[in-house]
Structures are given as C-alpha cells and as structure tokens.
C-alpha cells in the first residue's frame, strides 16, 4: 500500500496548499492508503485540474516517494506546484505515466528517479535507457518547458533502519555516483538541464549524511530543507539568466 503525507491535494496554489494542510498528518496517512493504480487515478485527476486551470508559473515534481513527500511549505513560493510523485516508483513506471500530465503547461518539470530501480536490481543500462526515453518524451510533449533532471541521491545503508536495509547494502554509493555521471551526459546530449544535488547530501565517506535522513533512504526535514534551498537557488539563477 502507498501513502501520501499531504493527502489528496488536487491542484492549488502554494497559499491554498498551506491552508489545506492543517489537518492531522496521521489521519491523512490512514485515510489515503492507496495502491499503485489508485495513485495513478489520483495523479491523473490532479493533472487534469492543472491542465484546465492553467495556473501561471506551474512547476511539476515527477518521481518517487522522495518527491511525493516533499513538504509543501518548503517549495519555492514563486511557483505553483503539481506533485506527480508515487511511492516506490521506478524509472520504467514513470516513463509509462508521463502522459498523465501531458496536457499541462508547466514552466519547469523536475525529475528525480532511479533509487527504486537499483533496489530492485535493475541494471544501469536499463535505467539509462529509461532516462533517455523520459527526457526525449518530455521534450516532445513539452517543447516550451524547461526539463530539469536531478541526480539520484546517496543512501546511508550502514546505519539504515529502513526495512530494505539489506538491499541498500548491496548498492555501493560509488555506483550511484557513476550512474549520475552517465545521466548527466545524456542530459547534456539531449539539451536538458541537470541539477546535481548529490554533493549536498554526502558526507566525507560518500554516504547520505545521517542528519538528512530518517531511515537511511528517505529524507528528514533537514534533508528536504537542503533540497528546497537548491531549488530556490536554481530558480533564482534561472530567473537572473533571463533578465
């Protein structure tokens, strides 16, 4: 079963999202235990609302649970946000559902995907092929949109409390670094932006900094604050480059 911290937000501007978020998070999690197909239906409906309302400065988060659980209050307030994350998502799964938001008109689409592929034993070659197709399809569907590929984050398997700790232990963070370099190369070839978050999250041993994670895989509030700061800085730099 999959859960969503924010509940079924549909689509609202940042201000409205904050007001929608005053209910007990625990109650929301219990209320919204959904399977994968149910999540697809929810995201399709949310994207439909965004496509109909056509809000200004729309940005989309596309990915897995790391994107899904991004605290709404930490997202840059200069934008309207549509969260298209699903817990446990893989690059292949994301590729198959890009059409869910193909009628929206976002300014930016931020993509982070891949850690669940590694956990499931999917080869780097397949991951890279999926990334290549994701970038190509997003460029075709959204020719006027800036596509931003974000690096796969490291993990902290040694001290992980996540239930799949053994699977994390089998994934060297050095492999993630190498995979990120190849993803960046594909992004460069396709004319897609690449946002390297990886250095912000690693310690001297190349692992996910312990204060930035809740269980060795998922992010803590501090972790999301680091990510949020990177998005803020990126947005400011992009805005400055257009002035």
Model-inferred region functions:
Residues 115-116, 139-173:
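Active-site segments of SGNH/GDSL-like serine hydrolases
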Residues 33-35, 78-91, 167, 216:
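Acidic/histidine-rich helix-loop elements
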Residues 98, 131-135, 180:
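Generic structural signal for well-ordered alpha-helices
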Residues 58-62, 82:
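Conserved beta-strand elements of the Class I
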Residues 68-76, 92-129, 154-160:
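Oxyanion-hole/transition-state-stabilizing segment in secreted/luminal serine hydrolases
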Residues 1-58, 72:
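N-terminal secretory targeting modules
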Residues 157-243:
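Catalytic His-Asp segment of secreted/periplasmic serine-dependent ester chemistry enzymes
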């Amino acid at each position: 079963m999959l859960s969503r911290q924010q509940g079924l937000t549909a689509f609202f501007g940042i201000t409205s999202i904050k007001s929608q978020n005053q209910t007990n998070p625990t109650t929301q999690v219990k209320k919204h235990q959904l399977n994968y197909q149910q999540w697809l239906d929810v995201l399709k409906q949310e994207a439909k609302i965004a496509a109909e309302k056509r809000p200004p400065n729309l940005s989309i988060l596309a990915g897995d649970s790391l994107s899904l659980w991004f605290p709404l209050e930490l997202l840059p307030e200069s934008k309207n946000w549509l969260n298209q994350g699903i817990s446990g998502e893989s690059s292949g799964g994301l590729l198959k559902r890009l059409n869910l938001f193909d009628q929206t008109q976002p300014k930016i689409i931020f993509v982070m995907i891949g850690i669940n592929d590694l956990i499931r034993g999917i080869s780097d070659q397949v991951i890279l092929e999926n990334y290549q197709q994701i970038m190509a399809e997003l460029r075709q569907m959204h020719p006027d949109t800036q596509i931003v590929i974000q690096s796969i984050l490291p993990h902290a398997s040694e001290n992980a409390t996540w239930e799949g700790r053994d699977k994390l232990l089998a994934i060297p963070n050095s492999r993630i670094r190498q995979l990120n370099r190849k993803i960046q190369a594909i992004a460069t070839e396709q004319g897609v932006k690449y946002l390297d978050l990886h250095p912000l999250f690693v310690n001297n041993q190349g692992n996910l900094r312990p204060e930035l994670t809740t269980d060795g895989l998922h992010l803590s509030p501090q972790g999301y604050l680091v990510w949020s700061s990177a998005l803020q800085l990126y947005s400011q730099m992009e805005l400055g480059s257009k002035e």
